[in-house]
From Swiss-Prot:
Gene symbol of the encoding locus: gpsA
Localization (cell): Cytoplasm
SUPFAM superfamilies, sorted: 6-phosphogluconate dehydrogenase C-terminal domain-like, NAD(P)-binding Rossmann-fold domains
Domain of life: Bacteria
The species this protein was found in: Helicobacter acinonychis (strain Sheeba)
Name of this chain's protein: Glycerol-3-phosphate dehydrogenase [NAD(P)+]
Keyword Ligase: no
Length: 312
């Protein structure tokens, strides 16, 4: 089976490596991936698998399955330019909310791909661990369970992929946990202790579920891998970009400096503002996201965390 992965960042390369164990994988990216792919291809070849090949867009569109790992803020433009077939089978691995239109990923994608041909990847995982072949469990959300299982069956031996419905719950959980992860990084950076951190994450999970339920997300999704699992991973590890943003803010660094030092996209920053605006529009109570938005705009980190712990 031939699979095309769109997106040459760390996440896109990790997914190309993962799917490469059982499948012929092409990767499409503007950047030259010759050097980043070398080690991954050596590992694949040692397993008897075919190496990942970087190809142009025209060649990439000839695959049977598509995996999209493009930053959410650029996803709509990417779909417009890529011109995927309307009936393409697509697994979207991007997590976040489009700030410009306050749109969820599924709302963006359905303008370009038949809804029954869409799947969304969720659950706790880091690119750095996937390329090491470390075990993890993920969820593929789709209204088309046959397609979700088709993608699940293409995953490697070290990934346990579950097929579930509840697209909206899965994508909101994946986006919202990045917001809570920033707050988790701040909490640890200020050395507020394990009790405060546990309170923050517990209330953060409740907040995620409350927001998701408004749009039809199911409670069990937020209590499973897509919600609690991804939250507890992302809010507790230095491998998380959003967690590292929180650590930087705890050092009283301006957000611009933190992001410059990070050198990578931390979706939680823009997702925070999108969530707060959506919550205001619909009257959803989101104390952690609301307080974090103030912190990102320059509020004192100590004052912000004190207010957050009291309100959450």
């Amino acid at each position: 089976m031939e699979i095309s992965v769109f997106g040459g960042g760390a996440w896109g390369r990790a997914l190309a490596f993962a799917f490469g164990e059982k499948n012929e994988v092409k990767i499409i990216s503007r950047r030259d991936l010759n050097e980043p792919l070398k080690k991954l291809n050596d590992a694949l070849i040692s397993k008897g698998s075919a190496p990942i090949e970087q190809v142009d867009l025209e060649t990439g569109l000839k695959a049977s399955l598509y995996v999209v790992a493009i930053s959410v803020q650029h996803l709509r433009e990417w779909f417009q330019n890529a011109s995927l077939p309307k009936n393409a089978k697509v697994l979207i691995a991007s997590k976040g909310i489009e700030v410009l239109n306050k749109a969820f990923v599924s709302e963006i994608a359905k303008d370009f791909i038949e809804p029954n041909h869409l799947c969304f990847l969720a659950g706790p995982s880091f690119a750095a661990e996937i390329i090491q072949g470390l075990p993890c469990a993920l969820v593929i959300h789709s209204n088309n369970q046959a397609l979700a299982l088709e993608f699940a069956n293409k995953t490697p031996s070290f990934i346990r992929a579950y097929a579930q419905q509840d697209i909206i719950g899965g994508e909101i959980a994946g986006a919202y946990k990045n917001v809570i992860a920033i707050a988790g990084g701040v909490c640890d950076g200020l050395k507020l202790g394990n009790s405060a951190k546990a309170s923050l994450l517990s209330r953060g999970l409740v907040e995620m579920q409350r927001f998701g339920a408004f749009f039809g997300g199911k409670t069990e999704t937020f209590l499973g891998l897509s919600g609690a699992g991804d939250l507890f991973l992302t809010a507790n590890s230095i491998l998380s970009r959003n967690y590292r943003v929180g650590l930087g803010l705890a050092q009283n660094k301006p957000l611009e400096v933190v992001l410059e030092e990070l050198g990578e996209v931390a979706e939680g920053v823009k997702t925070t503002n999108a969530i707060v605006e959506i919550a205001k529009k619909y009257g959803i109570y989101t104390p952690i996201a609301s307080e974090l938005a103030l912190l990102l705009k320059g509020k004192s980190v100590l004052e912000s965390m004190n207010d957050l712990i009291r309100r959450a």
